[in-house]
């Protein structure tokens, strides 16, 4: 018989840098999870993606055991990395802060494909282009 899920905790944590300090500690402490066990497992699983923020969905079961799924980094994080900027524009419709190429957008769309609600690569690219536009990044 499958274990019954008690709680689902969603967090965004820098890859390889999970520690018991906030926000990880309090969120998992309330759910009754072994915080150090999670931190070690998460850091081991994400050490090759250093510098990126990784969304994680932790399923906590009634017996306080847990499993977690790491997702692909958020599109804005990948776009900022591709454009080489710290943050997007404060006024995206007026002030453009950077440019990215269609190839960079295609690469991001392919890496995000499993998490996007898109039927094909073209639709995924349009989603990423829309995100770029709302950040003040021009797509060439």
UniProtKB/Swiss-Prot annotation:
Pfam families assigned: Ribosomal_L11, Ribosomal_L11_N
Keyword Nucleotidyltransferase: no
Any one of the GO CC terms: cytosolic large ribosomal subunit
SMART domains associated with the record: RL11 (SM00649)
Modified how: One or more lysine residues are methylated.
A single MF term (Gene Ontology): structural constituent of ribosome
Keyword rRNA-binding: yes
Binding partners and assembly: Part of the ribosomal stalk of the 50S ribosomal subunit. Interacts with L10 and the large rRNA to form the base of the stalk. L10 forms an elongated spine to which L12 dimers bind in a sequential fashion forming a multimeric L10(L12)X complex.
Protein family per UniProt: Belongs to the universal ribosomal protein uL11 family.
HAMAP family, per the entry: Ribosomal_uL11
Purpose: Forms part of the ribosomal stalk which helps the ribosome interact with GTP-bound translation factors.
Name the record gives this protein: Large ribosomal subunit protein uL11
Organism expressing this protein natively: Staphylococcus aureus (strain bovine RF122 / ET3-1)
Gene: rplK
């Amino acid at each position: 018989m499958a274990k019954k899920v008690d709680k689902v905790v969603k967090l965004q944590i820098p890859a390889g840098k999970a520690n018991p300090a906030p926000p990880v500690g309090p969120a998992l402490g309330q759910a009754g999870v072994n915080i150090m066990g999670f931190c070690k497992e998460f850091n081991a699983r994400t050490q090759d993606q250093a510098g990126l923020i990784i969304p994680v969905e932790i399923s906590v079961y009634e017996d306080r055991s847990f499993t977690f799924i790491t997702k692909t980094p958020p599109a804005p994080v990948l776009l900022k990395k591709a454009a080489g900027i710290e943050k997007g524009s404060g006024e995206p419709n007026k002030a453009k802060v950077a440019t990215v190429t269609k190839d960079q957008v295609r690469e991001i769309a392919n890496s995000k494909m499993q998490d996007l609600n898109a039927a094909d690569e073209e639709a995924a690219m349009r989603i990423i282009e829309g995100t770029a536009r709302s950040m003040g990044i021009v797509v060439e």
